[in-house]
Amino acid sequence: MNTMLYPELYKSLESVRWDMEKDIPWDKFDSALLTDEQAKTIKMNAITEWSALPATEMFLRDNHNDSDFSAFISVWFFEEQKHSLVLMEYLRRFKPEMVPTEEELDAVRFEFDPAPPLETLMLHFCGEIRLNHWYRRAAEWHTEPVIKHIYETISRDEARHGGAYLRYMKKAMTQTGDIARAAFAKIGVLMASARRTEKPLHPTNLHVNQALFPRDTIQSRLPDPDWLEHWLDEQIRFDDSWEKKVVERILHNLSILFERSFATAQELNRYRKEVVLRLQAAQGASQLPA
């Protein structure tokens, strides 16, 4: 039985692919509505999106036994690099002095330590949900028509990527059962508790290479490592109401995935403990003499 998801996902993503020349209204640009401060945030997001490159290298390394998922990552990588490119193209046309240098882009390409693939999958699923909301809020903050359109466009891509990751999470549960449930619930509790943390919980803000600590997050390698918190708190105003939307979306999807309703991170954590106990019981039973 062929359970590969890549052929269908490729067709689905291809059918809604946007063209950088034809689908972005470059001729609608209004220079009076773009400040240097705003252009700097566009530059930082362009560099951040470039980090799909080391993430792809990590995915391919840690999923070398999963050709289906690895093939999907080729599409994900293409679209994420396109996000970086369209933001850089915007700057090239309208704020050329802000275009990231090759050195600035290269700075965010470094090796990530190996990590459990199922936990990484869930982490990036949550990351896509968060980025979708960040970009939607950014589109509301900007008044310049072209960049508003760009953020709206790439936010929809992030939502579709999250949907694709969810398909692979369902597949993993079919294949490994409670092992996958435990991994997804563990990261889900962390990501749904984001309001209790000092820093934004997104893959680009997490430490991924112990030997390079503390410069082992994507954000720590940007020209302004503190830009993200300022962008979220002082510029696009990603406040508690928006944070609540992210958490609700994560819990909603996990409720569907696990076929059990979760309204809070605490409820999800109780479920996680149940799954861990089942795994421990199964492991203990398997070690009993026949």
Tell what function each PLM region has.
Residues M1-A290:
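Non-heme di-metal
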